[in-house]
């Protein structure tokens, strides 16, 4: 095994559990391999299946030492464009892109040719948004060969320099800066401030 690649993440919680297990294995067995990770954007709103934005996704896993982070499967090259660009600007590590060969047709096949896909990816290459390119659904060795040829003489992405700030996330990202106002998180779970919440905790009614 040369590296590990938890990929096509729909739910960031699953990926975090996977990365935790990998980290524990490395520690327990005194080994280390490079780890890549990727996410899938499931619709044109730019969110994962569980509702996270690209920036929120990155904030959720940025504590783990990764070789790269990227977008995989997804909506095809053209509709991935804004999310690949965004990830390139916020991740201070290598970025990757493994698109489908367009969207599937009504028969479950893919109509986009290797040349068409490679031509669309030229935009990503010329803008230096990616360090690693590949393919996902619908791609074959012919597609990978066309992508490789398109990328052969292009300069790789320069890794972004990101200001060191506290970056949190739920479905949306939250960045705390020196000039941020006072921020209170989880005040509704304060047993001293809410009689209702205190009663639920005392009675073990955690699902209420």
Where in this protein do the model-derived segments appear?
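Domain-level signal for soluble alpha/beta catalytic cores
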Residues: 1-208
């Amino acid at each position: 095994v040369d590296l590990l690649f938890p990929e096509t993440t729909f739910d960031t919680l699953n990926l975090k559990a996977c990365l935790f297990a990998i980290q524990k294995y490395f520690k327990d067995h005194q080994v280390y391999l490079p780890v890549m990770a990727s996410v899938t954007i499931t619709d044109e709103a730019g969110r994962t299946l569980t509702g996270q934005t690209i920036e929120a996704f990155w904030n959720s896993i940025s504590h783990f030492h990764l070789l790269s982070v990227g977008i995989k499967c997804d909506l095809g090259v053209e509709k991935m464009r804004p999310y690949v660009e965004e990830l390139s600007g916020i991740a201070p590590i290598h970025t990757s892109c493994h698109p489908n060969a367009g969207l599937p047709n009504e028969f479950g096949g893919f109509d986009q040719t290797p040349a068409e896909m490679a031509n669309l990816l030229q935009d990503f290459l010329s803008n230096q948004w990616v360090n690693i390119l590949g393919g996902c659904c619908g791609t074959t060795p012919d597609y990978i060969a066309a992508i490789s040829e398109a990328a052969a003489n292009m300069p790789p992405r320069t890794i972004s320099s990101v200001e060191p700030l506290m970056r949190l996330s739920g479905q949306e990202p939250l960045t705390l800066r020196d000039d941020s106002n006072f921020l209170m998180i989880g005040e509704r779970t304060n047993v001293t401030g809410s009689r209702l919440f205190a009663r639920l905790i005392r009675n073990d009614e955690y699902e209420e």
